[in-house]
Amino acid sequence: MLASTATAEARIAGANLYQIKVVRENKGTIAIYSTYIDGIVLGSAGLTEKTARKEGFEIVCGVVDGVDKHPATLPGTVKSKVKLIFSKQSGIILGGQVSCGMSCAQVINLIGIAIQKRMSLTELETLQMATHPYLTSAPTAYPLVLAALDAYSKM
């Protein structure tokens, strides 16, 4: 799990060491992880709901249950769950967790990018994405968009 973080930091250090003329800085560690257990992929990026509350953030969470392929009758379809944590005041994403099939890796990495770029729930609800029946949820039921909409409805 530390290799992902170390690799990102090493790219920055290497670029700075060799004076590559691009601004590179570490804006902090997101804490982004994924694992595979008996056919289910789990991922987490940023703060969990429990940690955010413990740290004193006023938050709103968006949660969505779905499937990782469309239609759900395709062979190998796995149930999915996505939870996104947002600041209640600003709507900026603070964290997210996912549970699903192999497509979970791309979803948790998108959440990590959203955290790093300080995206708001309104930006996530208008996210444009590529979908394919065997690779992703349906474009009408994309979990990041639906979780952002769920959070928005609670603000």
Positions of predicted regions on the chain:
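A conserved FAD-binding loop/helix module that cradles the flavin
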Residues: 1-47, 135-155
